[in-house]
Amino acid sequence: MAGGSTGERPFGDIITSIRYWVIHSITIPALFIAGWLFVSTGLAYDVFGTPRPNEYYTEQRQELPILSDRFESKQQIDDFIK
């Protein structure tokens, strides 16, 4: 080992190994598929509590729900929800 070495494998050795590509050829596409399913099924809206695109405006309320008074924000939010 050279001076100052941490004893870890060099990055070049890692990315040129067969084992690296066998593992990552499965895990990287799986992560993309999992993310796509998370968003496309709407689970992301449920987990993070954000409104779905068709829930931003209701039939009764078509204006932008913008808070204008920070001290009365709770009351304004309650009015927007109604």
UniProtKB/Swiss-Prot annotation:
Q: List, alphabetically, the HAMAP family matched.
A: PSII_PsbE
Q: Where are the transmembrane segments?
A: 22-36
Q: What is this protein called?
A: Cytochrome b559 subunit alpha
Family assignment?
Belongs to the PsbE/PsbF family.
**Localization in the cell:** Cellular thylakoid membrane
Q: Which GO terms describe its cellular component?
A: photosystem II reaction center; plasma membrane-derived thylakoid membrane
State whether keyword Thylakoid applies.
yes
Task: State the organism of origin.
Answer: Trichodesmium erythraeum (strain IMS101)
Q: Which cofactor does it need?
A: heme b
Q: How is the cofactor bound?
A: With its partner (PsbF) binds heme. PSII binds additional chlorophylls, carotenoids and specific lipids.
PANTHER family xref list: CYTOCHROME B559 SUBUNIT BETA-RELATED
Q: Name one GO molecular function term.
A: heme binding
